[in-house]
Amino acid sequence: SSSSAASDVYKRQAENVAKQYSISRTEQQEFAISSHQKAFEAQSKGNFNNEIVNIGTCSQDSNIRPGSTQEKLDGLKLAFDQNGTVTAATSSPLTDGASATLICEEQYARDNNLEILARIVSTSVQGCEADTMGLGPIGASQKALERAKLTIKDIDIVELNEAFASQSLA
C-alpha cells in the first residue's frame, strides 16, 4: 500500500540521517528521555489543557513516557535496521490525532474578538532527497529566518520531540 511505502521511507530516512551525521543510539535516547521529561512536566502543569480537546476516551497525550531511562531504552530492539540506531523510543509512534488552526487576517481577528496568538512573518519550503527528507525543515527554517531578517536567537520556542530524534539532533 502507499501508506506502507511512505512509512518505509520515513524509517529509512531516520537511519540515513543518523548515519550521515554520526548520531548514536545513546544520543537519540538522551534526546528522547529529555523530550518525554519536558512533555510530562508541561502536561503536569496543565500547559496542554487548552490544546487538547477531551473526546471522552482521551483527554491527554498518551505517548508521553515520563519513566523513560537510558537503561530501559537500551533494552529496546532496533526498530528498522539491525545494524542501525533507531528504536521505537526514538522514532515516530503509531498514534492517532488531529489538529486545526485558524489562520486569518489580523483585522478579521480584531473584528471578531479572536485572540491573536502569532503572526506569520515569513514562510519557506526546501526540497531534499527522499532518503534524508527529515533534513528538509533545516534549510526551510534557515531560509524563512533569513527572509524575516531574524536569527534562531530571535525565536523564543522551538518545538521538537523524540519522533525521529536523529533529524531533530541533525
Where are these regions (language model features)?
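Short glycine/threonine-rich loop-to-helix capping motif typified by GTGT followed
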Residues: 59-64, 130-137, 162-170
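Conserved small-residue
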Residues: 14, 28, 73, 96, ...
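Single conserved hydrophobic/aromatic residue that forms the stacking wall/gate
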Residues: 1-6, 10
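Active-site pocket-shaping loop/turn-to-helix segments
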Residues: 7-8, 19-33, 86-100, 121-147, ...
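Structural alpha/beta core scaffold segments of enzyme domains
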Residues: 109-110, 146-152
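Structural signal for hydrophobic packing residues in well-ordered secondary-structure cores
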Residues: 14, 18-21, 25, 32-47, ...
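N-terminal extracellular/periplasmic Venus flytrap/periplasmic-binding protein-like
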Residues: 27-111
